[in-house]
């Protein structure tokens, strides 16, 4: 039996979707709101600090602005991947935006995983990772595909969250933390 690899991976990056100034503003707002921090630690799986943006009123203007930007990127992604209206859900919603900080402490990272692993997460169909700064290390790796996305302020990474897209958030190797905003599109 023969097969032909079509090499379509549905992984896309879009640079400069928000300004460096807005990236810096989001990072400053994060650091000013330590009382909103939610430390996520699961040994040998993940370690980072996050804020669920829509749970706090001070983040509403930022969440609204990001949603407008993300909406434009959905249509760009559909065009770039040749996804037609017949292939894409007519209605969808965003999962709560989470801003995450990965510190250069030798611990913070997100090991190899997929983002749909059970009935609850099965409503996810598209990943959004918006990088807010440019640390050393901290790449998002797709180990089975040999793809590594380097964090860059204002860069958006989009890809499917299913078993086909094993990925990892690698450790920061320099002195600067990595900051991202992440979300998913949901079937509704």
Predicted regions and their residues:
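Fe(II)/2-oxoglutarate oxygenase catalytic core
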Residues: 1-156, 164-188
């Amino acid at each position: 039996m023969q097969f032909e690899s079509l090499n379509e991976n549905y992984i896309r990056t879009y640079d400069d979707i928000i300004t460096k100034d807005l990236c810096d503003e989001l990072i400053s707002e994060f650091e000013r709101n330590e009382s909103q921090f939610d430390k996520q630690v699961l040994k040998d799986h993940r370690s980072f600090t996050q804020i669920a943006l829509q749970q706090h009123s001070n983040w509403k203007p930022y969440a609204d602005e990001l949603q407008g930007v993300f909406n434009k990127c959905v249509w760009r992604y559909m065009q770039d991947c040749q996804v037609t209206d017949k292939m894409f859900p007519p209605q969808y919603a965003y999962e709560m935006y989470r801003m995450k900080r990965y510190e250069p402490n030798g611990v913070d990272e997100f090991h190899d995983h997929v983002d749909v692993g059970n009935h609850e997460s099965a409503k996810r169909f598209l990943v959004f990772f918006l990088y807010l700064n440019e640390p050393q290390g901290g790449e998002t790796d797709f180990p089975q595909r040999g793809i590594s996305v380097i964090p860059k302020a204002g860069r958006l990474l989009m890809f499917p969250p299913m078993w086909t897209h094993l990925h990892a958030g690698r450790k920061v190797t320099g002195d600067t933390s990595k900051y991202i905003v992440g979300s998913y599109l949901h079937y509704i």
